[in-house]
């Protein structure tokens, strides 16, 4: 019984596989060769009509081919390049009124060249140098006077420093603002402290008093 059941199951499986394959074939619509992809357009020949959106691409390709052919022909026909240059000149605006700028170089020792408008020439470099000389002399004189004035102003201060003369008291109040007392004069003498002087005197007195006692003791010892 088991073997018969296995044989029946195998037969059913085979039958089901056949039906499944038939169902898959029924779902297909037409053959793959009937479908035309974009890559297959134009393979049948120029007789078949192409879609409208392909016409634009063909016209652009045709124009590119003409441009390439023109560029290659210009190598052998230099007249073609001249014609193209003439066409570009016609498109550009004509600037006939503009004049080329002339670069003028100044001469090192001579006078400057006159202007194009007919104006008189400029002064020579020698005149300019002569006009600069008095200004330099005046500056030199001013600097000399300024140096002498500064030396005169500095002389009393230098003398005071060298001689050790103190500055007058009249200069101090001018620098002190109103309402403040003038500072006291600084004395160069050293001040003696009271404590130190008193201590010194006390030590001297003690030493003077102690001397006779020591001398008396020494004399007593000698006698004994």
Curated annotation (Swiss-Prot):
Residues 29-42 form the CRIB domain. Expressed in columella cells from the root tip and epidermal cells at the base of lateral roots, leaves, stems, flowers, anthers, pollen and siliques. Residues 69-84, 114-132, 144-155, 215-224 have a biased composition (Polar residues). Induction: By auxin and abscisic acid (ABA) in roots. Keywords: Cytoplasm, Cytoskeleton, Developmental protein, Growth regulation. InterPro entries: CRIB_dom. Disruption phenotype: Reduced primary root elongation. Transmembrane segments: none annotated. Changing residue 37 to D: Loss of interaction with ARAC11/ROP1. Residues 38-224 are annotated as: Disordered. GO terms for biological process: cell morphogenesis; cellulose microfibril organization; cytoplasmic microtubule organization; pollen tube growth. It is found in: Cytoplasm, Cytoskeleton; Cytoplasm. GO terms for cellular component: apical plasma membrane; cortical microtubule, transverse to long axis. Over-expression of RIC1 in tobacco germinating pollen reduces pollen tube elongation. Interacts with ARAC11/ROP1. Functions as a downstream effector of Rho-related GTP binding proteins of the 'Rho of Plants' (ROPs) family. Participates in the propagation of ROP GTPase signals in specific cellular responses. Required for cortical microtubule organization. Promotes microtubule bundling and formation of well-ordered microtubule arrays in the neck region of pavement cells. This restricts cell lateral expansion to generate the narrow neck morphology of pavement cells. Its function is inhibited when it interacts with activated ARAC4/ROP2. This is CRIB domain-containing protein RIC1. It comes from Arabidopsis thaliana (Mouse-ear cress). The gene is RIC1.
